[in-house]
A protein has these predicted regions:
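Catalytic cores of Mg2+-dependent Asp-rich isoprenoid enzymes
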Residues: 28-40, 193, 259, 307-315, ...
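A glycine-biased, small/acidic residue-tolerant capping/turn segment at secondary-structure junctions
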Residues: 5, 12-13, 234-244, 271-278, ...
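Divalent-cation-assisted or electrostatically stabilized phosphate/pyrophosphate-binding catalytic cores
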Residues: 81-121, 172-192, 216-219, 241-267, ...
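Conserved N-terminal diphosphate/IPP-binding helix and adjacent helical/loop segment
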Residues: 1-110, 163-181, 242-243, 334-344
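Active-site alpha-helical segments that house and flank conserved acidic catalytic motifs
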Residues: 54-82, 150-158, 193-196, 201-204, ...
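All-alpha helical catalytic cores of prenyl diphosphate-utilizing isoprenoid enzymes
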Residues: 4-18, 26-36, 116-127, 131-238
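Acidic/histidine metal-binding catalytic segments
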Residues: 53, 139-148, 211-217, 272-276, ...
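Well-ordered alpha-helical scaffold segments within catalytic/enzyme domains
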Residues: 40-47, 127-135, 198-207, 263-269, ...
Length: 344
């Protein structure tokens, strides 16, 4: 990413813009690059060669991912991302050094830090778009690539919107009931498309695969995307905070609607007990109690079972798919196995 990151800060930019974008560049470095890998794999499946022409698209997508995570961090009021302080949090701390006693300072500080995060994310979106246009100006599949890319952005935004409103309704408007189908819709829009199906589709489109072939392969990968998110939800509660790069309690504090939560409140007698802790800052003892509730209610076991079923479904569909060359099937199956055993 360093090759592209260094171009994100324009020497002619205002010093305030340079400061903000330097934080974006820092956040845009040292990711897992799973989505870039899937773009490369999709391209190899289609083009059957490695001429590196997929690299700008992969870099653009990783930049889009960072941009949308910056927005996500503002929405969730998150403090840590990828093991680093979030951009808006860095500005909170920077402004705190002003040590002002004005009664309006705290509100203004938070509003300004969050606004900077939104601006930086917006800039990141269009940097990503520019990278695609400038790199593939004369490519015959540019229009199709942009259409797919924009569909991914739109679907991710829709998933994020549901993910924002659902917890609010669940916490404050009791007539609305969070059901598993709502959770699955978020997983499909916000994770499956954005993390698995979208990147692989972009690579295949760039490489020249037909719509029929792309549709058959994305069908095989859709269950994988949902399994990926369920794994994330489990790691978010039971994983190592250092490995996952965020606090274990963040899903609880943010009242996140996960499969663990949905199962517990809709299928067990632990609904009221869980709701005593959800949406609150928890002590270690209280957080361990939430973990225990998910276990004794059967939610943890249910989530694992559902996740493993989806991993197996994706494996079977990949193996049966005649449009994926054997060599790339083996790589895809290895990738699925990695997602199964990952701890971050």
């Amino acid at each position: 990413m360093n090759k592209w990151n260094k171009n994100f800060i324009n020497k002619k930019d205002n010093v305030l813009v340079k400061d903000a974008m330097s934080k974006f560049v820092f956040m845009n470095s040292n990711g897992k690059y799973l989505r870039a890998l899937l773009i490369a794999l999709g391209y190899f499946i289609a083009a059957k060669n490695d001429d590196n022409s997929y690299l700008p698209l992969a870099a653009a997508y990783e930049t889009f991912q960072t941009a949308i995570l910056v927005h996500d961090d503002v929405i969730d009021n998150a403090e840590i991302r990828r093991g680093k302080k979030t951009i808006h949090k860095k500005y909170f701390e920077k402004f705190d050094k002003y040590d002002l006693k004005d009664s309006s300072f705290e509100e203004k500080k938070n509003n300004t830090g969050n606004s900077i995060g939104i601006c930086v994310g917006d800039i990141g979106f269009y940097i990503s778009n520019n990278m695609i246009v400038e790199s593939y100006m004369n490519h015959p599949n540019l229009a199709k690539v942009l259409k797919c890319y924009n569909d991914i952005v739109i679907n991710t935004g829709k998933g994020e919107l549901i993910d924002v409103v659902l917890p609010f309704n669940e916490q404050y408007y009791s007539k609305n009931k969070c059901l598993e189908k709502d959770i699955m819709e978020i997983y499909n829009l916000k994770t499956s498309w954005y993390t698995i199906v979208g990147p692989c589709s972009l690579g295949m489109i760039l490489g020249g695969n037909s719509e029929r072939v792309i549709e058959s392969i994305t069908k095989a990968l859709s269950p994988l995307g949902i399994a990926f998110q369920i794994k994330d939800d489990i790691l978010g509660i039971y994983g190592n905070a250092k490995n996952i790069g965020k606090s274990n309690t963040s899903d609880i504090t943010e009242y996140k609607q996960t499969i663990l939560y949905s199962y517990t409140v809709n299928n067990t007698e632990y609904k009221e007990e869980l709701k005593k802790y959800y949406g609150k800052s928890l002590s270690e003892k209280e957080f361990n109690k939430v973990r225990e509730i998910f276990e004794v209610s059967g939610a943890k076991n249910y989530a694992y079972t559902k996740m493993n079923e989806l991993f197996e479904e994706s494996k079977k569909l990949v193996i049966k798919n005649r449009n994926i060359p054997t060599y790339y099937k083996e790589i895809l199956l290895g990738f699925i196995r990695y997602l199964e055993i990952r701890d971050n």
